[in-house]
Structure formats: C-alpha cells, structure tokens
C-alpha cells in the first residue's frame, strides 16, 4: 500500500475548542458520536505468535456518519458531517476531513478519539478489523452535541450512523429522532443495539439493518425470504420505519416499504475489501433521494455505490465514476 502522510497546520490541542465556533448549514447533516481514525495495512498472511512485517500504513477518517458524508461529498451533495472528537487523534481525524474538503463540524470532547486498525491478508483477500473502545464523553459534551443538532437541523435529511460512545445515554438517538420528527425532517439511521431500538420507537424514515439485526428486532429467527419480508412489514406496520433497507451481505440487499418490496443481487466485482461498503450503500441511497429520485432508483444507486466501494483498497469508499459505471448493471426484482 502507498503510504500517505498529512501534517496538521493547526496547533494541538488548543484549537479543538476554536473549531466549535465554525457553523455551516446544509441540506444533509450526518452525525457520528464515536468516530475513529482508520489505520490500514496489508500483509501476505496473518499468523499467530510470529512478528508480521506489514506494508506501509495509510490513514482515513472513519466512523459511520463520517463515511456517509465523504460519499455524499464526492457525489456532489450539500452535506455537513458533525462528529465528536478530541485529542491529537481527533485533530488528525479532523484534518483528514478538511484535506478531503468535506464540510464538517467538530464537536470537541476532552478524551482522545479512538483508532481502528485493519489488516488485509493478501493471500486470502480477507480483512481483519480491530476496533478499539471509544472515549468516555461527559454529560456536558452530550448536551452540546444535542444543542448543535437542534440549532443546525438540515433541510432534507438527518443521517445518524455508527455506535454511541461510552457515556452517551441509550435514548440519545431517540431524542434526536423525536426532535427531527417534530420538524418534519426525515431520519436515516444505521446503528444497532439498544440505541437503535430506542430510536425506532420514535419512528424513522429509513434504517439499514443486517439480517441478524432484523432478527433481533422482531425476536425470532428469519430462515427465508418470505420471513424477511414479513419482519420488515411488521416493523413498518408498527410505524418504526417507513423504509427498511435490509443488508444481505453476499446475497445483495432488499428494500421494503409499506407497499413496495424489491431485491437486488450483489454485483460481481473484483473485491479488494469489504470495508466501507455499507456506508457507501447508505450514502448512495441518500444522495439519490436528495436528488429527487424515487425509492427504486435510490436502491439502485445504493447497490452501485456499495459495489464500487468493494473495488477500493482500504477505506477510500466508492468513487463517483465507478458508481455511475456500475449503475446499469444493477438488476432489481419486485417481490
């Protein structure tokens, strides 16, 4: 892998407090509570006990909402990425966002932003991902985050993606969803666990579960396609979501609404990595909806963006050229 270096032009850590003053408004706001500086490398074979000489490491700003914003920026959407970050690692993460010219707002925290370490095994094509715990955030920092979102609600979509940081209340995503709903703002959420469950009680526009997460939500096994559709319809009938984009991994994906249901097989591409495919899917769908496309075409864009991300090494995410090149290859079947 090619080594990339980027030196911050700002002093650390004092200027972290200054970034809070910069406010921008947009059509789309993404929120990431527990971002990570993604460090990636590769090796021929992963072995236990032995010292393994890796290739040069590369860095990218990571975190669910951060990655969605990076995709939206590349595709040309008016988007701001807001994220909690702190310490030297947080500054490096922020500087990478500025380097990519993504409109962003750092919500400063006291403790150090985490790193995420991934190793690509060349011999097998597998990715080994090591995720460190996030920093503890204070009640005041959580409240500052909520106030920022409340004061800078976007015009079209609020995208909440990724897990909550230690110290963040379980109902925080639910509070944000309730706030957005009060203003008629659609919420797109890609999360898991109790924080997701609480948000769904408020009713979101769209969320993207895996098959395992969907099974946990409905409380029973989902052995076949019919059961998947039934589970999605049950959640929609309970007004937990208007649209469910069900990720099926190598089997593709499914999109279900109250009166529509489609499935698409995964595109056959030369897979370099699976990292970032899910975030690219969300970014592709939201971008298409932002541009006024209907749900079917948004699904197609999501599938194309996800496949385009598989072509990249590390987490560069999808590139617009590949998204538009792959789009005609996406075949969607109505169910």
Model regions: which residues?
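Short, small-residue-enriched loops and turns at beta-alpha junctions
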Residues: 135-138, 164-168, 195-197, 253, ...
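Conserved phosphate-binding/catalytic region of the ribokinase-like
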Residues: 197, 225-335
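Glycine-rich phosphate/adenosyl-contacting loop at the front of the ribokinase-like
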Residues: 1, 11, 16-82, 90-91, ...
């Amino acid at each position: 892998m090619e080594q990339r270096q980027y030196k911050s032009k700002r002093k650390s850590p004092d200027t972290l407090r200054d970034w809070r003053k910069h406010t921008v408004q947009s059509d789309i706001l993404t929120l990431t509570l527990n971002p990570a500086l993604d460090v990636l490398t590769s090796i021929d074979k992963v072995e236990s006990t032995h010292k393994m000489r890796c290739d040069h490491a590369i860095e990218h700003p990571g975190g669910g909402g951060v990655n969605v914003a990076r995709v939206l920026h590349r595709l040309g959407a008016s988007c701001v990425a807001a994220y909690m970050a702190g310490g030297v690692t947080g500054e490096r993460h922020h500087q990478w966002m500025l380097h990519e010219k993504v409109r962003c707002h750092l919500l400063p925290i006291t403790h150090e932003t985490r790193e995420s370490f991934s190793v690509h095994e060349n011999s097998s094509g597998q990715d080994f991902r090591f995720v460190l715990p996030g920093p503890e955030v204070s009640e005041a920092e959580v409240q500052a985050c909520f106030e920022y979102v409340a004061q800078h609600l976007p015009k079209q979509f609020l995208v909440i993606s990724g897990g909550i940081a230690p110290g963040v209340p379980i109902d925080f995503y639910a509070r944000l969803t309730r706030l957005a709903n009060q203003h008629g703002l659609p919420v797109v959420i890609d999360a898991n666990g109790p924080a997701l469950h609480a948000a769904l009680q408020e009713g979101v526009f769209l969320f993207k579960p895996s098959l395992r997460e969907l099974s946990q939500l409905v409380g029973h096994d989902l052995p076949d396609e019919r059961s998947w559709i039934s589970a999605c319809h049950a959640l929609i009938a309970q007004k937990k979501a208007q649209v469910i984009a069900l990720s099926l991994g190598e089997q593709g994906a499914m999109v279900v609404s109250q009166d529509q249901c489609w499935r698409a097989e995964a595109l056959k591409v030369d897979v370099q990595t699976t990292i970032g495919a899910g975030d690219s899917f969300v970014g592709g769908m939201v971008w298409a909806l932002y541009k006024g496309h209907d749900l079917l075409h948004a699904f197609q864009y999501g599938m194309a963006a996800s496949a385009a991300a598989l072509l990249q090494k590390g987490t560069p995410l999808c590139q617009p050229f590949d998204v538009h090149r792959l789009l005609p290859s996406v075949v969607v079947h109505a169910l």
